[in-house]
Amino acid sequence: MNGAKQAPEISVNRAGRQARIVAILSTESVSSQSELAALLAVQGIEATQATLSRDLEELGAVKLRGADGGVGVYVVPEDGSPVRGVTGGTGRLARLLGELLVSSDASANLAVLRTPPGGAHYLASAIDRAALPYVVGTIAGDDTVFVAAREPMTGAELAIALEKLK
């Protein structure tokens, strides 16, 4: 035996497995799918890398690095749900803006938000989920989020509004 205690394998459906993944990612710093598979195995849940990859995508999990560029860890949106306008979305958005927003700029109807490397998708998802009435939508790269303002708001006004939320 390799020393790691492993529970007997149990049969868990997709929803149960994903609930365990959310629980693990909310309490552990997991930097790889193989590490996640090992943590699930300890609980008696066997999952292939392909299955974990699909689960992480469905949960909206992203790998986030700190501003220092250290090792990335998986994070899942607090509610684990891919739906817009979840309860508490603006409170969560305010917290994430405080943690991730490095700077903001604007052009025409776009607010351009800068994050640490790897943070843009997570911030864009939070903006989308908050369902702000003055936001049409977001596009995220690695460290940049374009946020489209709903007319008559300008990108500069939107950038200021988002800065005030943090």
UniProtKB/Swiss-Prot annotation:
The keyword Thylakoid does not apply. GO terms for biological process: L-arginine biosynthetic process; protein complex oligomerization; regulation of arginine biosynthetic process. Regulates arginine biosynthesis genes. GO terms for molecular function: arginine binding; DNA binding; DNA-binding transcription factor activity. The lineage of its organism: Bacteria, Bacillati, Actinomycetota, Actinomycetes, Mycobacteriales. Its main location: cytoplasm. This is Arginine repressor. It comes from Mycobacterium marinum (strain ATCC BAA-535 / M). GO terms for cellular component: cytoplasm. InterPro entries: Arg_repress, Arg_repress_C, Arg_repress_C_sf, Arg_repress_DNA-bd, WH-like_DNA-bd_sf, WH_DNA-bd_sf.
